[in-house]
Amino acid sequence: MEVSENATTRGSLALVSIILPVHNAEQWLDECLMSVLQQDFEGAMELSVFNDASKDKSRAIIEKWKVKLEDSGISVVIGGHDSPSPRGVGYSKNQAVAQSTGSYLCFLDSDDVMMPQRVRMQYEAAGQHPTSIIGCQVRRDPPDSTERYTRWINHLTSDQLLTQVFTSHGPTVIMPTWFCSRAWFSHVGPFDEGGQGVPEDLLFFYEHLRKGGGVFRVDHSLLLYRYHLYAATHSVLEMTIWTHRVHFLEEQVLPHWKSFTIWNAGKQGRKLYRSLTAASRHKVVAFCDVDENKIRKGFYCYEDSQERPKPKVPILHFQAAQSPFVICVKLDLTGGEFEDNLKSLDLQEGRDFVHFS
């Protein structure tokens, strides 16, 4: 059964709708909803919750907070269903958006906590960047979980928000920090509703970029971003994400290059080479590396190829290789050694190389 209810009369539409999908979130909801109540934004605000077949006390907690929020002037729309199984994050977000009224959408996950300034600061930024997804910096809980990832999302430059969209880290501003206009969401969306195992945020982000959307980050830590084993992120298969990433690279970058070098003659570089279409593989002029053993080997032979003779790709020292590069070396892992090597070549990110690690 689908239900949607709103006790307040909708005489005036909200300026900002907070979009909150919920599935069995009882242990985090109080803190999450308290953070909605504590927003210092002075415009009309609405909370749109979609309860995706929760079997715990989530529904009762939402009902309790509905009263508190409406008493403080925040209207609340509750939708949901009580089918035996959940329909997934993409479906829930689409439903929460559809039942909401705000001109702007502020996405929130039920296990995260907003800082009081979040809606206000992102709303201001969205007014200046109407076709962008607005993100923000985050604080991780627990603090020592995913340190490299957290550093990456908090410190990308404004250019890198667009050039580093091919890495395994996914969207350069993370989904629970997204804020955008409803008009732009409708132009790009909706989210993929394939359910468990579908990286719906990544697919939406790619579609947003295809349509010429920008990416902007408010440089304040406006979200407490929780890491735990129940997170929906963990249900997405690495291979699924890999396939989408390779396809996006082949669509967005490789058509502009006549030839290129894959930086990393090891496992990741070879995996990328094998994952490319034949047309893209033919553009690979070399692998490059710093590992003397790999370089001494001289070449990589693609054994699984149907071609005769089988393709042999030279392996060079990075200083002897030709740009542009697709870089398959993980960032922030080699104590700065890789970053120094890359810097020594004086290349421009996005034009002379992209990161695909």
Curated annotation (Swiss-Prot):
- Which InterPro entries does the record cross-reference, listed alphabetically? Glyco_trans_2-like, Nucleotide-diphossugar_trans
Q: Which GO terms describe its molecular function?
A: tRNA-queuosine(34) galactosyltransferase activity
State the reactions this protein catalyses. queuosine(34) in tRNA(Tyr) + UDP-alpha-D-galactose = O-5''-beta-D-galactosylqueuosine(34) in tRNA(Tyr) + UDP + H(+)
Compartments where located: Cytoplasm
Q: Which parts pass through the membrane?
A: none
Q: What family does this chain come from, according to its entry? A: Belongs to the glycosyltransferase 2 family.
| Protein name per UniProt | Queuosine-tRNA galactosyltransferase
Q: Which GO terms describe its cellular component?
A: cytoplasm
Tell me the enzyme class: transferase
What domain of life is recorded for the organism? Eukaryota
- What is the role of the protein in this entry? Glycosyltransferase that specifically catalyzes galactosylation of cytoplasmic tRNA(Tyr) modified with queuosine at position 34 (queuosine(34)). Galactosylates the cyclopentene hydroxyl group of queuosine(34) in tRNA(Tyr) to form galactosyl-queuosine(34). Mannosylation of queuosine(34) in tRNA(Tyr) is required to slow-down elongation at cognate codons UAC and suppress stop codon readthrough, thereby regulating protein translation.
Sorted keywords for this record are: Cytoplasm, Glycosyltransferase, Transferase
Q: Give the species.
A: Mus musculus
Q: Which Pfam families match?
A: Glycos_transf_2
Look up the EC number in the record and give it: 2.4.1.-
